[in-house]
Amino acid sequence: MDKLSLYGETFTSRLLIGSALYPSPAIMLDSVRASGAEIITLSLRRQNPAQQDGKAIWDYIRSSGCKLLPNTAGCKSAKEAVTLAEMSREIFQTDWLKLEVIGDDYTLQPDPYGLVEAAKELSKRGFKVLPYCTEDLVLCRRLLDAGCEALMPWGAPIGTGQGLLNKYNLGMLRERLPDTPMIIDAGLGAPSHATEAMEMGFDAVLLNTAIAKAHDPVGMGVAFKLAVEAGRAGYNAGLMLKRQTASPSTPTIGMPFWRRHD
């Protein structure tokens, strides 16, 4: 079976899901289950199980049975990210980490310098780092050199729902790093965006807002599940090459009245 492989572990689902912004913890849990996701992201700052206000959400997340992927959301320096990562490892008992180091409050674009610095230090400390990054090829290579075994390039700024804004760079990134697991993270707003990412050969997608803010989060979880599966199946089957001119699907050989119009 075609499975997702990350840091020596395999997963049936290629959809990763976030745990924030849902109308209620119960709807969050139902949406996660409907999506079929096996990895769920969470923030220590929002969902610290040691604090009373985070206990209810933590109980729901734990009951989902998903693998936990803590993130360093809100960190603006490598030092902050490393500190929060160590706290998350102690509290959530996992060395998996979605690394975020934000360089701009308006676009929430990752800070490439802080990201590489933090990735290098965290890899030395034994973390399995999945960095949230841009589609910049040079940056992605630096992250791999820093010890990351997978990458999480954005499709568009977080929460915008714009889909894949820079398809050329994303396509080039996929082509130049064919053996690196890559998860499109952030900016996906519709199931069709997820399908497109999978058709391009990306290994998985991670999203939150598109499901959490839908009118029916549970139904949207199902929609994204099917979209990811369809996109992956299409990629594996091999998409037809695009053409600049029309090509009839019905043969014209032997048709008595066919002629070419210039």
UniProtKB/Swiss-Prot annotation:
Keywords, sorted A to Z: Cytoplasm, Schiff base, Thiamine biosynthesis, Transferase
Domain of life from the UniProt record: Bacteria
Primary localisation category: cytoplasm
Alphabetized Gene3D superfamilies for the sequence: Aldolase class I (3.20.20.70)
Pfam families from the UniProt entry: ThiG
Binding-site residues, 1-deoxy-D-xylulose 5-phosphate: G159, A186, G187, N208, T209
GO molecular function: thiazole synthase activity
Places the protein is found: Cytoplasm
Protein role: Catalyzes the rearrangement of 1-deoxy-D-xylulose 5-phosphate (DXP) to produce the thiazole phosphate moiety of thiamine. Sulfur is provided by the thiocarboxylate moiety of the carrier protein ThiS. In vitro, sulfur can be provided by H(2)S.
Known partners and oligomeric status: Homotetramer. Forms heterodimers with either ThiH or ThiS.
Family: Belongs to the ThiG family.
Protein name: Thiazole synthase
